[in-house]
C-alpha cells in the first residue's frame, strides 16, 4: 500500500464519526419537534397525578414518546460523534463531554418514560412503583439537565462556530431553558407548562445546525486531505 493510500484511508476513518453529526442532529430535530407536537395533553383539572393519568392513557402517548426517544437517541449519538472530532478548544471539549453524558442518561430516562403508560392505573391509585419513581426522577432532574445541556451546547457551539453560529445559538438557548424549566416544575405546578411549545425551538435549532454542518464537513474534508495527500505523494 502506498503512502498516499494509507493517508487517505486514515483521513477517511478519522472523518467517519463527524460525518454523521449533521444528519443525526437534523433527524433528531425533526423527531423532537414531531414528538412534541403530538404529545397528549390533559384537561387541567384535578391533581397532578390525575392529569398525568390522562396523558398516560391517551392514544398518542406511545407515538409521541417513541418519536421523542428517537430524538434523544439521535442527539446522544450525534454529540458522542462530535466529541470524537479533533480541534475542539478546552472549553468546547469540556461542554461536549458533560453534555454527552447527560444525553446518554436522558435517552435511558426517556425509554423508561415511554413505558410509564404500562403503570397508568397504579400511578392513578397512588402506588409508588419503580416506574413512578423513575418517571419522577426523570422529569424533575434528568430532563431539566438535558435542557440545560442543549442550551450550553448551543451557546458554546455557536460562539466557537463549531455547532451553528452566534445567530443559531439563540434557538438552542431559549428552547433548552424553556424545556428545562417546564420539565423541572411539571410535577408541582401548571404555571410553566406553557413553555413546552417554546421548547420546540430545540428541534428547529438541531435541524438548522445539522443542515449547516453537511456542506461544512464536505469542504473541510477536501481542504484537509489535499495538502496531506500532496505531501504524502511527494515523500513517496
Where are these regions (language model features)?
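Hydrophobic, aromatic-enriched alpha-helical segments typical of multi-pass transmembrane helices
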Residues: 2-236
